[in-house]
Regions:
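Residue-level preference for short coil/turn positions at secondary-structure junctions
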Residues: 16-18, 79-81, 120-121, 160
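C-terminal capping/extension of enzyme domains
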Residues: 1-17, 28, 33, 40-42, ...
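Internal catalytic-core helix/loop-beta-alpha segment
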Residues: 80-139
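N-terminal nucleotide-binding beta1-loop-alpha1 segment
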Residues: 22-25
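Short, surface-exposed acidic-centric catalytic microdomains
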Residues: 31, 35-104
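Secondary-structure boundary/capping signal
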Residues: 58-59, 123-124, 144
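Short, conserved, surface-exposed binding loops centered on an aromatic residue
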Residues: 13, 75-78, 117-118
């Protein structure tokens, strides 16, 4: 049986005023999505983390009482804050048919140069987990040591000076409390010069 190659279902979200870009790996399968936008799985805590960091309310981006997030509200916030969202993977094979990074075979990574050209003011990249960090580092012209979770490293890409911070995964499978994840993201965004709660 031939393995199915999937292309990322959503385009990168790249506000013109972007100073920070968040990069995960690859969205979950369609039946796991609560909206048609990045980090769509209601079981993933990304938008709860954003709610806590910027509004002191983990339900801020929830769509009413639904088990779903509000994509329009999220996009409006990201646009205002200057935060981009772009997976590190363009095409992949799900070896076990699920969203696990452990069984994600990268067929084609993101065209990083093309993405960064569209956000000339971006200075900081936050990767949301180990696999995303590994993929991003594989795209750099020079070999860079994999940072530990919470660590920030400087790097140069196409003559641009940027920083890369490896953040904890917001997947429920990652063994860290929501409060601790929010604290790590808050520290990152504050370091990047964004206003947090």
């Amino acid at each position: 049986m031939a393995e199915t190659i999937e292309t990322r279902p959503f385009p990168p979200f790249l506000p013109k005023n972007t100073t920070v870009m968040m990069m995960g790996t690859f969205p979950p399968t369609s039946e796991k999505r609560s909206m048609e936008f990045h980090y769509p799985n209601f079981q993933n805590d990304m938008w709860r983390v954003y709610g806590l960091v910027f509004f002191d309310d983990k339900e801020h981006f929830r769509k009413g009482e639904e088990k779903a997030f509000d994509a329009d509200k999220i996009k409006a916030f990201l646009s205002e804050a200057g935060i981009a969202s772009c997976p590190t993977v363009l095409k992949a094979i799900r070896e076990k048919g699920n969203a696990s990074d452990a069984f994600l075979k990268v067929v084609e990574p993101v065209p990083l140069a093309e993405v960064l050209d569209r956000i000339p003011h971006c200075k900081h990249i936050g990767t949301t987990g180990g696999k995303a960090t590994e993929i991003l580092l594989s795209l750099l012209p020079e070999k860079v040591k994999l940072p530990k979770t919470g660590e920030t490293i400087p790097f140069v890409f196409n003559g641009r000076e940027l920083t890369l911070t490896r953040l904890p995964s917001t997947s429920r499978a990652y063994p860290l409390s929501l409060a601790k994840k929010a604290e790590a993201y808050k520290n990152f965004f504050k370091t990047c010069g964004l206003q947090t709660k």
